[in-house]
């Protein structure tokens, strides 16, 4: 479930890669260069912050070997420092509030799980020590370490995911969905992407339990460039 965090951060990194300006490929094989050169961007270098009203972070894992159980996080944030001239200098950071997990449980949880002491399945997942243990570990974080272009709109993003006090590298596949020179409601450039990835819960110290070990995460978001506030007007003479 924590994998969400990784996904959210990594996804951001992937976006950077997918939408950064093409680098000088002189001397490189023509076919390979053409197949991975990123599309031209309208967005410019700078810091891009996630638009929380246009973002989602979901995770799923095998359940009873017959289906995939899916839930989401409602509170998370991400920031991309985009350098279109040098992709290696671009950075992505993300944080997730594990207490915001939303299982959308439709049954009578209290009536069927009275012994747990939790008021809902979402609270159980968030606070139970065998799951997200949000009281002891109130944040899941991700910081990118590498972005590798794989196509004109795709990239692999690797970063450090810290979950349950354990930090491990996670790699995600990201897709650049498009960008705007000027957002229709905000006077600034905007960019969007999707990302997916997988990791094992046991790698972060979570017991296997009755559900699957491998977690799949899916992240979709729009990012808007930070604009410096206008300088105050000079006082009248």
Where are each of the predicted segments found?
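Gram-negative bacterial Sec-dependent N-terminal signal peptides
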Residues: 1-23
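Low-complexity, acidic/polar, glycine-enriched regions of mature
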Residues: 19-237
């Amino acid at each position: 479930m924590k994998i969400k965090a990784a996904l959210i951060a990594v996804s951001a990194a992937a976006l950077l890669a997918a939408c950064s300006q093409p680098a000088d490929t002189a001397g490189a094989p023509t076919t390979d260069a053409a197949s991975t050169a990123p599309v031209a961007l309208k967005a410019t270098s700078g810091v891009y912050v996630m638009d929380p009203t246009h973002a989602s972070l979901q995770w799923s894992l095998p359940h009873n070997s017959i289906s995939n159980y899916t839930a989401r996080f409602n509170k998370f944030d991400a920031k991309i420092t985009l350098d279109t001239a040098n992709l290696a200098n671009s950075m992505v950071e993300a944080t997730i509030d594990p207490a915001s997990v939303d299982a959308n449980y439709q049954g009578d949880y209290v009536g069927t799980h009275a012994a747990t002491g939790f008021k809902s399945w979402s609270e159980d997942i968030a606070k139970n020590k065998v799951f997200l243990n949000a009281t002891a570990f109130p944040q899941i974080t991700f910081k990118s370490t590498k972005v590798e272009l794989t196509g004109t709109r795709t990239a692999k993003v690797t970063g450090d995911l810290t979950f349950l006090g354990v930090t491990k590298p996670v790699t995600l596949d990201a897709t650049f969905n498009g960008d705007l020179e000027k957002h229709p409601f905000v006077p600034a450039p905007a960019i969007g992407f999707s990302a997916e990835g997988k990791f094992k819960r046991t790698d972060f110290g979570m017991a296997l339990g009755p559900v699957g070990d491998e977690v799949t995460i899916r992240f979709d978001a729009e990012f808007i460039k930070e604009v410096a506030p206008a300088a105050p007007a000079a006082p009248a003479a």
